Amino acid sequence: MSLVGVHNEWDPLEEVVVGTARRPCAGPDRSLLAVEYAEYAGPGRWQEVPTGPYPDRALKETEDELEELCEELRGLGVTVRRPGARDSAAPVRTPDWESDGYGDLCPRDGLLVVGDTVIEAPMALRARFLESLAYKELLVEYLAAGSRWISAPKPRLAEGMYSPSGPSGERLRDLEPVFDAANVLRLGTDLLYLVSDSGNELGARWLQSALGAAYTVHPCRGLYSSTHIDSTLVPLRPGLVLVNPARVTDDNLPGVLRTWQRIECPALAGLGYAGDVPHCSTWIGMSLLVVRPGLVVVDSRHRELMRVLERHGVDVLPLKLTHARMLGGGFHGVTLDIRRTGALETYRF
């Protein structure tokens, strides 16, 4: 029996990978500027972008908070796995470029589980080119136990791939398939794919070809131009979705969600961050981990969000990721669901 099996974002969680805050850093190169900090692409502003190692104290606090998350999930009967130890900050080189490594905080960004298949995504940042090495032993174990394991074609990520000065949402050119796994949400037979600065059109086309006729990949255009979809849409259970009111409108809401009940996320607490420039906005607080229908992990500082969820019959497990804005990972991002109960269904109501 395969140890891998996920069909959506909400079925009861049985096994999960939780990332680590050991030695993450931000590598200064063209891809980081285009994908994460394009507003600093002008003359003389590159130096304002935070690069290099993160503060030790923040990493220690984050690692402690991740361990608390692990313990809570274990207490709920969930099997918890962690990345293998490695020097994630070691330089990454190809014939075209060189970058510092990135880190292994967010397994969600690089690996996508669809059914019994684990897919290595062709990630947009050069620094993350070899990030899947942190999970290699786990992937081999899952393969030996009956899962499928495929990898998208390794992208070249040459200079021409990026357009830092281009319009938001068009800074990742369509020269080869490139996308982060966190650009994708699973709704049974339907997958939402965010076309943005961390996922291009060719990426959606490759994903559809890899998954075949059993699935429909829906490219979401004009929804959110920056990175990842989990701070914009959060499916909570069949027919109920949390939406970001600053981004989602009647016009750009994906068609498969139009018959679902929508909950607008309230304004989130203005969490602090170390340094002068945050990695992400306060909407990182929408990055929730659904443990099962009716229970989600949410940052305890977002009290109004917790109240809204509870009014809609969703219980909360309040925990904390103090440095989410600095490190760029909420509870959805720092986890990768490996197995959930349930079967493949279609959720078009």
From Swiss-Prot:
GO terms for biological process: streptomycin biosynthetic process. The keyword Transferase applies. It comes from the Bacteria. Its EC number is 2.1.4.2. The record marks G333 as: Corresponds to active site cysteine in strB1. Keywords: Antibiotic biosynthesis, Streptomycin biosynthesis, Transferase. One of its GO terms (molecular function) is scyllo-inosamine-4-phosphate amidinotransferase activity. InterPro entries: AmidinoTrfase. Pathway: Antibiotic biosynthesis; streptomycin biosynthesis. It catalyses: 1-amino-1-deoxy-scyllo-inositol 4-phosphate + L-arginine = 1-guanidino-1-deoxy-scyllo-inositol 4-phosphate + L-ornithine. Belongs to the amidinotransferase family. It is not obvious if strB2 participates in streptomycin biosynthesis as an inosamine-phosphate amidinotransferase. Attempt to measure its activity have failed and the nucleophilic cysteine which is the key residue for amidine transfer is not conserved but replaced by a glycine residue. This is Putative inosamine-phosphate amidinotransferase 2.
